[in-house]
């Protein structure tokens, strides 16, 4: 049965549950999977930047003729800031009947909203979602039931159990030598480095596009140096797929998604790709991961991945978190690691997430709907700009995992609200009259959340004192770049800032210990990316993507040694460190390639001094 579950006959009181992300024709609606741990599922979002998007539709099997009551799970996304009817309005038609209810613009949480009733014959019925505004209306699922009182659970475990009962999942099982979760730059490099050593690798990514924040979905350019002492061949592989042009919030072609995909597909003898699969569950016992379970964000297929070793390249430390790995989040107190720049008291402050955007020049004056949902812009508080990149940053005072939908939504809201003010309220707006929004990210670029703890935690003291460790590996070259709410923005939006400033602590290039790249209490878990074993301050230098790519390359090398010796990550440090050093000296990239990664290098530092052996 296609795209929707046919359950038993209506006389039983059961119905038909249709997951919106399963819709066969999505029209202009997009699949958004970023918040499944918060609200339970991927969903469809009508991200039209104020212009209604095309209809999404699918066909479902109706088990028996009769009247069906239609419920839609949706969310009024501006409700945290405004009591007004929200902007994300849409309607639904079922079996050719346009139902009267306007959905998605009332309430204050994810909930089942009643759309109306439709008389349906036995057989096939078409369901269509009609966006009315282009302002990010969202649909999680549609429930057709002969019993008007049979409303599914609102959320949580009860809703998950309901879904699994109505639409049971079949689990496909696969086995590999090495499973990498997260298809950003770190995960790409980890998987390819391992595959080039003959390791059978699975690479899982929860988006259809590879590259993470450097993809055309988020549009953050690469940063940091490659080819640095003590291992000057580390990072060569980034020259194989790294975009040739820099810049944040640029047109999609700048980010060369096809080149990234080709880089991965070239390793198909040893590397299997699983785009659009999101890890939701981990089987971990006695500090050892046996399997991870990933579900396709559109079809709902679940795959069990078994392997001796895994790498968490998710950014959020999702695999480690689900496995029970030790982790940190927020700022450590000064006493914890004796870092001179740490606050006296630790807190939950993190760097935020960016919803980047730009506008384009039109041939004639263009309009934009009035968008006013709780943010009171005026001539002093508005941002008189035609684009927004990294400084547009939200959620620094909120939990970047548990509250991320609100954080992303606030990023959308400030873009729309500010643009609305420039177009509709600002008197001297000649600069904006002939401009319209050309791109607004709905996949937010996150900088910081969980940091999984390894046998070594990189601290500010390591960096400023240039402490040399025997397992020195990839070299970080960026300054200690930390973000904080912009004081000017705080004057107008205290506690709800959406602009940031940064501080740059100058450090020399520093070779980070390998022991930062595996978990201290999950014995077969590597990590690469912004979720490695560092303090909040340490994260400030290692988090840029050329640097995370080199982390991944080292992890892939270590995974090859684990496979060869039937070893665990810690044993590479204790028993096989010389072999790892030999691999790092050689690198896993193709030799002889010109360095085409010379933009956004960052780092104001003296001449690098090679560490003494």
Where are these regions (language model features)?
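Beta1/beta-strand and adjacent pyrophosphate-binding region of the FAD-binding site
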Residues: 172-184
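Conserved N-terminal/central alpha/beta ligand/cofactor-binding core
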Residues: 193, 199-200, 205-281, 285, ...
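Active-site neighborhood of glycoside hydrolase catalytic domains
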Residues: 265-268, 292, 297
